[in-house]
Amino acid sequence: MIYITIFMILPCPVPCSHVFLYVFYIFLFLVLFIMTIYQSSQKLHFSNCYHNNQHHNSLHN
């Protein structure tokens, strides 16, 4: 999120076309979106493994 604010605050050194900015922002949001989904899926996966492991241990004990 920091990068987005930095890019918003930074003025363009050259007159940028609106299309370029549009594509750039879409790309930026897509990357962030994918990263958040990836992180949340990793957390879910981790918690499932942990849960299964606990269950497995309790069965053996």
From Swiss-Prot:
Keywords: Cell inner membrane, Cell membrane, Membrane, Transmembrane, Transmembrane helix
Listed name of the protein: Protein YncO
Main subcellular localisation: membrane
Membrane-crossing residue ranges in chain numbering: 18-38
Induction info: Expressed approximately equally in exponential and stationary phases (at protein level).
Membrane-topology annotation of the record: Single-pass membrane protein
Compartments where located: Cell inner membrane
A single GO cellular-component term on record: plasma membrane
